Amino acid sequence: MVGACMTIRPLVRYPDRRLAIPARPVTAFDDELRELAADLLDTMRAAPGIGITAPHIGVPLRVVVLELDAKDGARTYVNPEITWASPEMIMHREGSVSMPGVNDEVQRHARVRISYWDLDGTMQTEDSEALRAVCHQHEIDQLDGMFWIQRLSRLKRERLVKKFEKMSRG
């Protein structure tokens, strides 16, 4: 695309306190929001990752971008909330663009329903399962100030943090 410009923003790295602060709801559906969503997509692809939130780049707003595969493309979720979760649980390996190089199995609901607004400010609902359901839960946790490793046992969490610190030191 001629004239297209990628904007890759710096990622907030664990254990930055900003990752533990609940994000504020978006109230303005404008060009600034669309620019934020585009920057999130560029930053996520460069990381690389399949999901990112505005807090991952230091913006305390409830915005999520997911891109699980090329067929479905990228999707932006503004002010997403889980409105229903299945009783069935699954284990899935998770990680974060804010803590690259480490991952572990996390238990999540197998299916969820979310409500959210699109970039035009239209309310939407979406039912998801498998990887998309895991991503919805993971990213909404992040918007609520819960980093994914908080879902692990203390022993697993401490082991992952030590591994990440060692990797970060080089």
Swiss-Prot record:
Q: Which domain of life is it from?
A: Bacteria
Where are the coiled-coil regions? none
Q: Name one GO biological process term.
A: co-translational protein modification
The active site is formed by E139
Q: Which Gene3D superfamilies match?
A: Peptide deformylase
Q: Which Pfam families match?
A: Pep_deformylase
- Which InterPro entries does the entry mention? Peptide_deformylase, Peptide_deformylase_sf
CDD domains according to UniProt: Pep_deformylase
**GO molecular-function terms, A-Z:** peptide deformylase activity
What the record says about family reads:
Belongs to the polypeptide deformylase family.
What is the recorded name of this protein? Peptide deformylase-like
Q: Which organism is it from?
A: Bradyrhizobium diazoefficiens (strain JCM 10833 / BCRC 13528 / IAM 13628 / NBRC 14792 / USDA 110)
